[in-house]
């Protein structure tokens, strides 16, 4: 009887293997490592040439298939979260299993839509321009990945995406970054070629931190060696008791 109680206590005292959700939002809980901006190709509006301008200080991003009529002057968006992986509290550990990862952005102007790709070229929100990356971001396997991660809306001028929170599934991208298959430089948001109704959303510079881009990552931690040892001891003890009884 005493052995049975001991085994039960060993198993009961072992921590449950449950998933944990980590959140990363600029300016919240000490996290200050997100970057986001847009790059613009318009050089027709009022004689202004936007291609060499940097927009990293703005509190919004516009993803638009034609932001400067007449004709195909797109804006592209970029967003990244650095310092996601490591051994510090709140980071994704090397041995953790990433169960899911979602990016939530707050849309304050409805628009056509966009497609999202892994960024393969390093960039900074304080320096990148349409010209500096070479005529905008190309999904060519060099600047950005060739396979879309996410796509929403339609290739037209309608308001296909409404206002409010938009959630984007980036599980496969975060898993690839953890494995080292992609460099973890964030993501490019590329508008549809005829998506002339720009979608605008708040950036990490937005005054109210609660409406800034939010990355949520659900992870399953790897049990500590001591936990495995405790479970093994409990199971072995139960097995021994069962054998003696038979």
Each PLM stretch: what is its role?
Residues 2-8, 227-230:
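Sec-dependent signal peptide recognition
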Residues 13-15:
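N-terminal signal peptide c-region/cleavage motif recognized by signal peptidases
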Residues 19-89, 193-195, 206-212:
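Flexible, small-residue-rich N-terminal segments that precede or flank a structured functional core
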Residues 23-28, 107-183:
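Beta-strand-rich interaction/scaffold domains
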Residues 81, 95-108, 215:
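A short beta-strand element within beta-rich, extracytoplasmic domains
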Residues 189-203:
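Short beta-strand-plus-loop segments that form exposed binding edges in beta-rich domains
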Residues 202-221:
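A recurrent domain-boundary module in secreted/ectodomain proteins
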Residues 223-243:
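A short, hydrophobic C-terminal helix/tail in secreted or cell-surface proteins
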């Amino acid at each position: 009887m005493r052995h049975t109680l001991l085994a039960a206590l060993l198993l009961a005292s072992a921590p449950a293997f449950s998933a944990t959700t980590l959140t990363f939002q600029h300016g919240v809980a000490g996290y200050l490592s997100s970057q986001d901006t847009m790059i613009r190709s318009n050089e027709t509006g009022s004689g202004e040439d936007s291609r060499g301008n940097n927009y990293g200080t703005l509190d919004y991003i516009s993803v638009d298939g034609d932001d400067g009529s007449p004709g195909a002057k797109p804006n592209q968006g970029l967003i990244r979260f650095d310092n996601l992986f490591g051994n510090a509290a709140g980071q994704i550990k090397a041995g953790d299993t990433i169960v899911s990862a979602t990016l939530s952005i707050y849309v304050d102007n409805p628009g056509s839509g966009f497609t999202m790709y892994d960024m393969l070229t390093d960039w900074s929100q304080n320096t990148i321009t349409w010209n500096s990356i070479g005529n905008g971001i190309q999904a060519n396997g060099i600047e950005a990945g060739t396979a879309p991660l996410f796509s929403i809306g339609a290739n037209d001028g309608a308001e296909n995406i409404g206002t409010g929170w938009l959630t984007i599934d980036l599980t496969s991208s975060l898993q690839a970054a953890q494995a080292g298959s992609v460099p973890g430089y964030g993501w490019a948001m590329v508008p549809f070629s005829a998506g002339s109704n720009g979608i605008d959303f708040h950036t990490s510079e937005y005054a109210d931190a609660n409406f800034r881009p939010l990355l949520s990552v659900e992870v399953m931690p790897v049990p500590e060696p001591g936990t495995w040892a405790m479970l093994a001891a409990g199971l072995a003890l139960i097995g021994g008791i069962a054998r003696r009884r038979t």
